[in-house]
């Protein structure tokens, strides 16, 4: 193949099919080879030389069956099965396949043999009668394969006969072809058949393996046929007898090492009718049998040998060849004396063989002697080897037991042999105690029990035997004799063993619990016989030795012993142990009088305390009741909450006297409490018992309200489970008392109202924040008592638990099936109303404390309550009350009539004309319709009489409708409406006492408690601030006319912003986050700068700050600064943020006031001189306010945000480079502490892990949750790090911390780098990971964008490479470019950028100075990349400023060296390039061309 042909894409895979195609194309031109030839087919060439009548595809498949590789043969068989299934004419294929069956069915691959059988089955099934002509070839091989050593092949061969022939012909087929199979099998075994030699192409196994496999399979042919058809069938004998006539074959078998083959030959010999003759005619078989009677292998050689011995022993022919007395009998003795694995076989064959031996040996006397010797041989060579098989040992014991039983049941020999058996039994028993297996011990003890029950041996001999065994037990020790002792003393044993049992109990070194238990469980006769013989009762007197599982049996035995009048020496001391406690529970007069009567009461009390710890109330009740009957009173206070204890006491109360009713009621209430306070659900019998004792006057004492009044987080599932428990209990109560019990257990309507009353302070949230304009309560004119966050959440959580519990109970509703509707009782409707109110209260609470997420319990409580609420007529009726609850009106959708009635109720309809009131509830009016009706109706608006509810109502609804209408006010057709609404904002927010109307309040004067005096004023103010914010957002985001925007910004914004600043002064440090506080916070965040139009009247500094007095602050400024930083230390986060927002506006004033001289100086920005650097100061209130403790966790980060404000380039702050460096130095120490607080002191889940972990967790959460949605991890990074989100939400401080961290690494990269270097090592990798993964890439992107968007002039061209983070600056002078490369690392700013300067056009030391200066600015002085490039450009500009052209080359920068003219003439002061004067590589060679070393201009000599 040429090189072109070998190119990629031209190569093809080698395959048999490809080779066949090439050979077919070439015919016989390739040295006589054709597609039909194969070098591996030589062994089958005669059979396969001509495939006539089959197509090419089938021919190829048939050829595969003769391939050398077994995988190819397997593939060919599978393809052949497909052809058989898909092709209709397969006779020719079948004919050719039959010739291959002998080789394939004996193939070395089991898979090939298996597939061959399956293929034969397919042929037979499909061809049916047409397959008859090939049966003679294939059926013998199938029958042969039925005995294959591989089970799968044998099963497949059996399936051929089963599926290929009808049921009545199967046996005939086998009988017909069996002689052929036997003939083939015999030849294969003798090595005379062609199949016994592997064909040349079969490489699956070697010659020996194939020979062994086929020999085994051939002998199995005979044995399996005999097993299937019985030994009576003799058609197999002719061929089998040839095997035993072949002396060479037998010598080969028994002289070889194939044990399985020997066993098969022996088994075949045993199946002949004249088997003894066949065996004796083969001397090697007789020798083999005698030699393998004690074979230790795990093959069946030993059992086969004994089977042959059993056949030979009765034969007289065998006796003539082998002496029983001198040959077989000694051999038997040797086999018995030997202790090995052969005993597993001897157990089954020894006794029959010995019986036959004794029968053939003759006289009784001789037999007794032989039998005695055989029995003595059992105990020879003891003990057994330690490595002996336990199965073999057990077989030895079983064999000995069988011999003993046979001997003792034989009247002729039992008494004669007993004298020898007695010591042997003792020895065997002693040997059994050396093996810790129950089977061996059972074998021996069963034999002893059988001997005792047989009664053949007299009692004296039996007693002697037992005494000898007892002595062996004593000698063996406690552990070795354990099993024997337990089994000999088991219940149900013969009374003869009672003496042994008593002796064991009386011996402390031999007794154990099982022996004691056996006595306690024995029958009366055995127990009495044994107990009377016990001489020492110490085994039971030490009761502390028994555990709780043994105590029951011990107490039963003690009770039996106490009832036995003949036992006097029992001395038991009752203690607080398991036995003592069980004795107390057992009770009874006998135990009390003999054991418990004199026990100290303290012992009984300790028992009760123990049961209390184990929560065993039943035991406590039983014990207390028994002791009470005996006149002993016990303290049971600890068990008062135990359900079992209480139930048991109730059941034991037999008397129903009035004197016991009080005690009974107390127990019932305790049981009620215990069931519902338990972590686990009570049992059914507990509920049944409680329901039996509950009456209609049962009083739970507000149990569930107290149960749920817990400050800890409560599992919602527990509440629902408690409701289910109540349902279970109520269902079991009687119908006449059920409803009364429900009323006493669940919350009443009056109680619900009492709970709601404590949430009046949250009504302000509904009035101010509800999206339903009609939900306005103006009836509450008293001062609200605002709770702090902790207390408010606590009582709301408790109320939510109670509401969920009450509405979760199914017993609150009754069904009217005929109408398919719910009907509620008064209690149920009260619970539903209470549920509606609670979800409104939870929402109001969520709005109030918006910076902190609701607890998981409250969130889930709200969901669970909402799922169970039902909108029903009964609940709607509650809205028709004269004073409906504002929470219910907020949560429930009111109808038009209800809205009308609600408004009429609030607006004092008796004093308001109906036509004037109609505007408030008119149906189907849009917000614009309402505003126009009010605008044209002449109502008192904005500055109104505060004593009239109606005026409050119209103003509150007006502002809510304005908020709904939003920015559309600016484009309203009626321009008067726009001015009316906008002026109303200013009017309401700037209400003074100068108003002539009655009861007007000045909220901006010196009355900071104005809102507390009238909450309606706070709601109104809040709504108008909200309206301003809505309109302000509309101006920013919507398209409005230019005139409208200018009017808004020039008139309304300055005026209202000034009002906001004045409102800020009335915020108190301890003030709760009411709607006004939260809305003012939003308004403060919208302010860009401190208003200049704030009036300076009546300003009183709330706190004197000495640090501020040294600066030239105005009284107004000092007052606001002090107020802002006072609020920063508040415990209320919203108030903290208001202080922060105000301080943020005041920082520019503070910075300029406290650094006046430095900021006024006009510094040179070319170089930053450390020695002469001006000093700037951090505003003193920022450093002074830094907390010394961790109480105010957010103050540190908030102050850090204020401290770095001067570094941000804004209208208020424009610092040059030197001033930036000076300010960075000033805040260095503060920055370290504040950044540490930012990282470590945030109130998140990780108390001792940096906040960055929270940031990282948040990023991973979003990345996982929104990976396939709109929100991606990247967008979340930008949201957290780049966007300044000041929305008051639970994520506020997380986002604030993330943004502040990003600003810190942007403005103070060097300081952050130093901080990272010094933080503890366990935090360092986490900080590194977060900054690298999230912040660095955004920071690098920002830096590159800044540089990319900057303008540097014509001489400096800057480009960025975002992929590598490179910034390449090229400074061009004439045709020469000097290049500065800055590469930002991936973890910038934690690692420093790499810088490189190429083609410097100034001296090397000056270029290095520029780089060092840039390095110092970026690495140590918190310089930005853009500013560093600008500084480097200024240095280069200054370096080449005033540089003149070289008059030789007329260029400023040398084209080759990129240097400025440096060589100076002392006379004319002109400068030249050194290369222009002397270089030999340049066109200009002045010294050489002029042949002198003079100046080209003044001719002065340079030398």
Curated annotation (Swiss-Prot):
CDD domains per UniProt: RING-CH-C4HC3_LTN1
Gene Ontology CC, one term: cytosol
Protein's UniProt name: E3 ubiquitin-protein ligase listerin
SUPFAM superfamilies in the cross-refs: RING/U-box
PANTHER family, per the entry: E3 UBIQUITIN-PROTEIN LIGASE LISTERIN (PTHR12389:SF0), ZINC FINGER PROTEIN 294 (PTHR12389)
Pfam families: LTN1_E3_ligase_5th, UBC_like
Catalysed transformations (reactions): S-ubiquitinyl-[E2 ubiquitin-conjugating enzyme]-L-cysteine + [acceptor protein]-L-lysine = [E2 ubiquitin-conjugating enzyme]-L-cysteine + N(6)-ubiquitinyl-[acceptor protein]-L-lysine
Species: Caenorhabditis briggsae
Keywords, ordered alphabetically: Cytoplasm, Metal-binding, Repeat, Transferase, Ubl conjugation pathway, Zinc, Zinc-finger
Pathway, per record: Protein modification; protein ubiquitination
EC number of this enzyme: 2.3.2.27
């Amino acid at each position: 193949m040429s090189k072109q042909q070998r190119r990629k894409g031209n190569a093809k895979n080698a395959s048999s099919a490809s080779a066949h195609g090439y050979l077919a194309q070439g015919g016989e031109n390739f040295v006589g080879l054709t597609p039909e030839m194969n070098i591996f087919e030589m062994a089958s060439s005669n059979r396969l030389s001509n495939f006539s009548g089959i197509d090419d595809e089938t021919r190829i498949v048939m050829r595969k069956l003769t391939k050398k590789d077994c995988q190819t043969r397997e593939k060919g068989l599978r393809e052949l099965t497909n052809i058989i299934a898909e092709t209709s004419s397969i006779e020719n294929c079948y004919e050719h396949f039959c010739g291959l069956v002998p080789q394939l069915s004996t193939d070395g691959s089991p898979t090939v043999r298996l597939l061959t059988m399956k293929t034969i089955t397919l042929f037979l099934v499909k061809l049916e009668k047409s397959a008859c002509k090939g049966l003679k070839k294939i059926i013998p091989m199938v029958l042969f394969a039925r005995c294959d050593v591989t089970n799968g092949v044998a099963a497949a061969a059996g399936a051929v006969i089963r599926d290929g022939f009808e049921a009545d012909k199967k046996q005939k087929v086998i009988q017909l072809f069996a002689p052929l199979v036997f003939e083939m099998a015999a030849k294969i075994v003798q090595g005379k058949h062609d199949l016994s030699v592997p064909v040349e192409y079969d490489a699956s196994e070697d010659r020996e393996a194939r020979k062994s496999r086929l020999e085994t399979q051939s002998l199995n042919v005979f044995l399996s046929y005999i097993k299937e058809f019985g030994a009576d069938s003799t058609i197999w004998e002719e061929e089998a007898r040839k095997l035993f006539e072949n002396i060479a074959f037998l010598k080969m078998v028994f002289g070889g090492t194939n044990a399985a083959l020997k066993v098969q030959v022996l088994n075949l010999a045993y199946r002949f009718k004249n088997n003894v003759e066949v065996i004796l005619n083969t001397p090697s078989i007789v020798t083999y049998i005698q030699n393998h009677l004690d074979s230790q292998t795990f093959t069946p050689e030993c059992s086969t040998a004994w089977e042959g011995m059993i056949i030979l022993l009765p034969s007289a022919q065998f006796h003539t060849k082998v002496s029983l007395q001198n040959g077989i009998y000694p051999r038997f003795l040797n086999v018995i004396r030997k202790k090995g694995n052969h005993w597993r076989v001897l157990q089954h064959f020894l006794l029959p063989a010995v019986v036959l031996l004794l029968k053939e040996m003759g006289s009784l006397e001789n037999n007794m002697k032989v039998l005695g010797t055989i029995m003595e041989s059992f105990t020879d060579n003891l003990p057994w080897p330690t490595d002996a098989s336990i199965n073999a040992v057990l077989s030895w014991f079983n064999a000995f037991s069988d011999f003993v039983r046979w001997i003792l049941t034989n009247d002729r020999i039992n008494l004669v042999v007993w004298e020898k058996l007695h010591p042997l039994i003792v020895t065997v028993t002693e040997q059994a105690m050396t093996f810790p297996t129950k089977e061996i011990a059972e074998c021996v003890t069963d034999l002893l029990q059988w001997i005792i029950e047989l009664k053949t041996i007299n009692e004296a001999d039996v007693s002697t035997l037992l005494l000898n065994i007892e002595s062996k037990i004593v000698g063996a020790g406690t552990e070795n004799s354990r099993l024997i002792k337990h089994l000999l003393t088991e219940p149900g044993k013969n009374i003869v063993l009672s003496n042994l049992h008593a002796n064991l109990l009386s011996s402390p070194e031999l007794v154990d619990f099982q022996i004691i238990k056996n006595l306690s469980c024995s029958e009366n006769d055995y127990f009495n016989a044994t107990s009377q013989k016990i001489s020492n009762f110490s085994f039971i007197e030490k009761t502390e030795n028994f555990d709780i599982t043994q105590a029951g049996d011990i107490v039963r035995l003690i009770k039996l012993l106490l009832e036995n009048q003949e036992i006097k020496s029992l001395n038991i001391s009752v203690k607080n142990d398991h036995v003592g406690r069980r004795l107390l529970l057992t009770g009874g007069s006998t135990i009390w009088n003999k054991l418990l009567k004199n026990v100290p009461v303290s012992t009984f009390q300790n028992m009760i305390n123990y049961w209390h710890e184990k929560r065993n109330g039943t035991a406590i009740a039983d014990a207390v009741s028994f002791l009470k009957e005996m006149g002993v009173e016990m303290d049971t206070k600890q068990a008062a909450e135990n359900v079992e204890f209480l139930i048991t006491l109730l059941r034991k109360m037999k008397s129903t006297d009035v004197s016991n009713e009080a005690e009974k009621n107390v127990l019932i209430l305790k049981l009620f409490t215990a069931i519902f306070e338990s972590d686990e659900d009570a049992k059914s019998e507990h509920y049944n018992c409680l329901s039996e004792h509950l009456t209609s006057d049962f009083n739970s004492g507000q149990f569930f309200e107290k149960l749920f009044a817990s400050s800890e987080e409560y599992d919602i599932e527990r509440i629902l489970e408690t409701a289910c428990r109540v349902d279970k209990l109520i269902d079991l109560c009687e119908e006449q008392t059920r409803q009364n019990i429900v009323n006493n257990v669940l919350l009443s309507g009056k109680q619900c109202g009492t709970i709601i009353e404590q949430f009046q302070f949250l009504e302000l949230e509904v009035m101010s924040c509800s999206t339903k304009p009609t939900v306005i309560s103006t009836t509450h004119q008293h001062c609200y008592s605002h709770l702090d966050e902790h207390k408010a959440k606590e009582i709301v959580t408790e109320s939510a638990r109670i509401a969920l519990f009450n509405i979760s109970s199914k017993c609150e509703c009754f069904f009217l099936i005929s109408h398919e509707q719910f009907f509620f009782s008064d209690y149920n409707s009260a619970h539903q109303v209470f549920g509606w109110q609670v979800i409104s209260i939870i929402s109001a609470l969520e709005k109030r404390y918006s910076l902190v997420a609701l607890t998981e319990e409250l969130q889930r409580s709200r969901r669970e309550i909402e799922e169970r609420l039902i909108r029903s007529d009964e609940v709607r009726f509650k809205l028709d009350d004269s004073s409906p609850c504002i929470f219910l009106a907020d949560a429930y959708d009111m109808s038009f009539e209800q809205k009308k009635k609600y408004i009429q109720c609030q607006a004092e309809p008796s004093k308001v004309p109906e036509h004037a009131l109609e505007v408030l509830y008119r149906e189907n009016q849009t917000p614009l319709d309402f505003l126009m009706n009010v605008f044209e109706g002449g109502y008192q608006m904005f500055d109104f009489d505060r004593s009239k509810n109606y005026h409050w109502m119209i103003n509150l609804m007006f502002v809510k409708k304005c908020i709904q209408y939003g920015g559309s006010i600016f484009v309203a057709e009626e321009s008067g409406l726009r001015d009316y609404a906008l002026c109303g904002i200013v009017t309401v927010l700037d209400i003074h006492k100068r108003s002539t109307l009655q009861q007007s309040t000045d909220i901006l004067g010196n009355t900071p408690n104005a809102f507390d005096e009238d909450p309606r004023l706070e709601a109104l103010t809040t709504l108008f601030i909200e309206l301003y914010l809505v309109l302000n957002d509309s101006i920013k985001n919507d398209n409005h006319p230019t005139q409208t925007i200018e009017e808004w910004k020039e008139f309304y914004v300055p005026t209202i912003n000034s009002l906001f600043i004045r409102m800020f002064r009335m915020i108190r440090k301890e003030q709760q986050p009411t709607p006004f506080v939260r809305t003012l916070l939003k308004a403060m965040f919208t302010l860009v700068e401190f208003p200049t139009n704030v009036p300076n009247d009546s300003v009183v500094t709330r706190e004197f700050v000495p640090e501020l007095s040294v600066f030239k602050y105005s009284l107004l400024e000092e007052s606001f600064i002090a107020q802002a930083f006072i609020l920063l230390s508040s415990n209320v986060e919203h108030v903290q943020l208001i202080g922060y927002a105000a301080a943020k506006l005041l920082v520019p004033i503070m910075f300029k006031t406290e650094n006046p001289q430095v900021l006024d100086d006009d510094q040179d920005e070319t170089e930053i001189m450390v020695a002469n650097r001006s000093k700037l100061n951090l505003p003193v209130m920022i450093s002074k306010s830094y907390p010394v403790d961790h109480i105010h966790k957010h103050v540190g980060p908030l102050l850090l945000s204020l401290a770095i404000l001067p570094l941000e380039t804004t209208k208020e702050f424009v610092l040059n480079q030197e001033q930036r460096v000076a300010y960075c130095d000033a805040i260095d120490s503060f920055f370290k502490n504040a950044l540490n607080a930012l990282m470590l002191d945030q109130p998140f889940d990780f108390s001792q892990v940096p906040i960055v972990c929270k940031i990282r967790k948040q990023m991973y959460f979003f990345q996982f949750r929104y990976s396939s949605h709109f929100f991606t991890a990247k967008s979340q990074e930008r949201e957290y790090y780049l966007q300044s989100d000041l929305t008051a939400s639970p994520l506020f401080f997380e986002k604030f911390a993330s943004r502040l961290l990003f600003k810190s690494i942007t403005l103070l990269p060097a300081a952050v780098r130093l901080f990272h270097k010094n933080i503890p090592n366990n935090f360092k990798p986490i900080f590194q990971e977060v900054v690298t993964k999230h912040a660095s890439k955004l920071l690098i992107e920002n830096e590159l964008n800044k540089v990319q968007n900057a303008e540097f002039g014509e001489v400096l061209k800057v480009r960025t490479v975002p992929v590598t983070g490179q910034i390449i600056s090229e400074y061009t002078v004439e045709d020469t470019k000097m290049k500065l490369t800055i590469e930002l690392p991936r973890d910038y700013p934690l690692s420093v950028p790499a810088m490189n300067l190429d083609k410097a056009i100034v001296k090397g030391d000056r270029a290095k100075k520029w780089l060092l200066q840039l390095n110092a600015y970026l690495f140590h002085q918190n310089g930005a990349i853009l500013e560093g490039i600008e500084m480097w450009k200024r240095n280069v500009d200054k370096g080449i400023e005033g540089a003149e052209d070289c008059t030789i080359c007329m260029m400023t920068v040398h084209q080759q060296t990129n240097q400025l003219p440096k060589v100076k003439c002392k006379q004319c002061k002109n400068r030249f390039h050194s290369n222009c004067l002397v270089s030999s590589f340049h066109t200009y060679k002045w010294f050489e061309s002029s042949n002198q070393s003079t100046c080209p201009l003044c001719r002065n000599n340079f030398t």
